């Protein structure tokens, strides 16, 4: 079962075994691509595209399509609902998003989910100022 999928929540742990009590070995971030190696009702065995890491995640919060246009370029990009009210949620550095709409200083990346325009860069952006990277 070799398919490409994208994770659609903030992030989740990758476990060594099919249990939340198992050792956490890595994480999958919002918009990160992965391949499903096997699946059952509650768990997916995956291989991440970024670093080829293999492990288990819960069988939820993923989709087959995701047109990535930008990446989060701050440690934590706060998520706002209706681009006015800050929520407790955030997207971590390197999360990959699709810009759906732009309003003022905010971009919409999902229904009722907005982040500040200054928190993202185009997906193909390469930072040449290494001091700027170290400040992140």
Model-inferred region functions:
Residues 1-19, 27-30, 37-40, 47-50, ...:
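SH3-family beta-barrel domains
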Residues 120-122:
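Long hydrophobic alpha-helices with heptad-repeat/coiled-coil character
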């Amino acid at each position: 079962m070799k398919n490409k999928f994208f994770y659609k929540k903030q992030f989740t742990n990758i476990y060594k075994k099919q249990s939340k009590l198992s050792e956490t070995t890595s994480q999958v971030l919002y918009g990160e691509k992965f391949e499903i190696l096997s699946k059952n009702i509650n768990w997916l065995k995956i291989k991440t595209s970024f670093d080829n890491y293999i492990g288990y995640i819960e069988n939820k919060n993923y989709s087959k399509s995701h047109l990535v246009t930008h990446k989060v370029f701050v440690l934590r990009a706060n998520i706002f609902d209706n681009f006015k009210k800050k929520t407790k949620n955030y997207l971590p550095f390197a999360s990959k998003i699709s810009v759906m709409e732009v309003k003022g200083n905010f971009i919409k990346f999902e229904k009722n989910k907005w982040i500040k325009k200054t928190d993202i860069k185009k997906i193909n952006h390469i930072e040449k100022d290494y001091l700027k990277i170290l400040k992140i």
